[in-house]
Structures are given as C-alpha cells and as structure tokens.
Regions:
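Accessory C-terminal segments flanking Radical SAM cores
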Residues: 11-117
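Well-ordered, non-membrane alpha-helical segments in soluble/globular domains
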Residues: 77-80, 197-204, 230-233, 259-265
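Core AdoMet radical
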Residues: 136-146, 157-198, 211-228, 240-261, ...
Length: 279
C-alpha cells in the first residue's frame, strides 16, 4: 500500500481497491504484465515519437509502417517487443520506475493504470491475443509545436516561438544544453507546423477507428487553440457524440480574442451532453 491511499480511519479509496484487484489479476498472467502498454499512448506527432505510460522514454514511430497501417502510430515494432517481454514475465528496463516501487513492496503505476476502467475492460482480449494490434482507450496527442509563448519549463521542441528565438539569439546558458539548437537533431527536431506531416496524416486516417474506442482524449501542444486539428476534433465530436468520452485541452489560454471566442463557442456546444466530461 502506498502512502496516502488509506486514511487513518481505515477508509480505502476505490482507486486503491481497483489497483489491488488489478495486481491480483495481472499476476495470473505474469509479474510484469501492464495493460497501459496496450491501452494508453502519448503521440508526439511533430517528432514522430510515442510512449505508453509517462515513465518509459519516447521511441520512434517508423514512418514507413504507417502507409498500410495507421495504427502503427501506437502498435510499433518496439512496443510489441516490450509487450512480448511482459507476457513472458520479463521486466523491460524502460519500466524501471515501477520495478523500483514494487521492490519496496508498494503498488506501482502499473497496478494503478491497469486498474482503471479504460484499461481493465480489455484484459481478456489482450491476454487472448497479446501480439495483435489494439486500439487504445486513453490517448494524448500534440499535433504540432506552434505556440505563441516560450515558457521556461517547456522546450523549443514544443514551442515554435522558443525555437525561433534560439535560432536567432542562441540558447540560454544552462548547465545541461537542453534548449540549445544542436540538442534538437534527428527525432528531437520537430517537423515545422507549416509543412506536411506524415504522422498527422496517419492520425486522421486512423481517427474514425480510434474514436470508437476512445474514453479519454487529451490535446496538448504547442498551443492547441492555435491548431486547426483541435477544431477538426471538436467538429467530429459534435457530429458524432460520445457519452463516455472525457475530452481535455491543455492550453496557455493566452491566444487572440478571436481564437478565444472561437474556443468558447465550441466549449458551449460540447458541454450540452455531447460528451461525458470536458476540461
């Protein structure tokens, strides 16, 4: 049990109870099985990177695999190898955060994530055919890095304004050169938002299938209120209401009045019973 999961009077949260049940169920398959590796994904489309769960490092989505299978945005070869290790009871190095927690006798995020309804509902499907492509229920996406701010806790990778500044003036003198232009090479270098992006194209090809399974969908950036893809999502949701969808937008809320009013108009429409929750 983790600190804070149970109060002094013995009350146990449903979150904890579900995690404990998930642990018992996961252990019937293997001591390293984690449903998040199948049912959750964060997609960084400007760089063609993804991960399932926030703890493992991002890995590349081979662009050539998307032509005939847009779900390869999530079901990458690398991720399938990690899933295979989990089914064999082996502990992937990238998940060391959870292994450390569990070695101390605590529940880890592996148990908490696997205990959430969006993940646990497909336990039997995954166990029956773990190497098959699967549609995630919890998706976070950033479509491009266009942003009007350059917040110090962010990165030029996620802010076109900051990227433009370091190109003109050079990097801030930090001990680790994480905002230096030379740091953003290869997969760290975002595709400019003004250019065609094969990862975004693949996302929209996959979207109708993905949407059917979605329960949690979060759009980040860049600044999503500046991005046409955000409003394309809104239009689709309004045309295809989904009563179990939790829709989330992470915004700096510092856009022009025109964009702010446009966003508010969509929020009013979305909050009239089209989805379960908007934030």
């Amino acid at each position: 049990m983790n600190k804070g999961d149970e109060s002094g009077d013995g009350f146990k949260s449903k979150f904890l109870s579900d995690a404990e049940l998930a642990k018992a169920k996961l252990d019937t398959v293997s001591p390293s099985f984690c449903l998040a590796k199948w049912k959750q994904v964060s997609l960084h489309l400007p760089t063609g990177l993804n991960n399932s769960c926030y703890h493992p490092p991002l890995h590349e989505i081979p662009v050539e695999t998307l032509k005939n299978n847009p779900s390869a945005l999530h079901n990458t070869r690398e991720k399938k190898e990690t899933r295979k290790l989990m089914m064999q009871g082996k502990k992937p190095d990238e998940c060391h955060y959870c292994w450390k927690m569990e070695s101390n006798g605590d529940l880890s995020d592996r148990h908490y994530r696997s205990g959430e309804p969006w993940a646990s509902k497909d336990f039997d499907v995954i166990v029956k055919n773990p190497q098959a492509d699967i549609t995630p229920s919890y998706v976070e996406v950033n479509f491009n890095n266009a942003c009007n701010l350059k917040c110090s806790y962010c990165s030029p990778q996620f802010s076109s304004t900051w990227m433009s500044e370091i190109k003109d003036l050079g990097a801030y003198p930090t001990s680790t050169p994480h905002n230096a232009l030379e740091h953003f090479v290869g997969s760290r270098l975002p595709i400019p938002h003004s250019q065609e992006n094969p990862y975004v194209d693949a996302f929209w090809e996959w979207w109708p299938e993905l949407y059917k399974e979605l329960e949690h969908f979060r759009m980040t950036g860049g600044e999503p209120l500046m991005d046409k893809n955000t409003y394309k999502v809104f239009d689709y949701v309004l045309e295809n209401p989904k009563s179990n969808l939790h829709l989330n937008v992470t915004s700096n809320l510092s856009v022009t009045d025109a964009l702010w009013n446009k966003y508010l108009d969509y929020v009013k429409l979305l909050c009239t019973g089209k989805i379960e929750h908007f934030m």
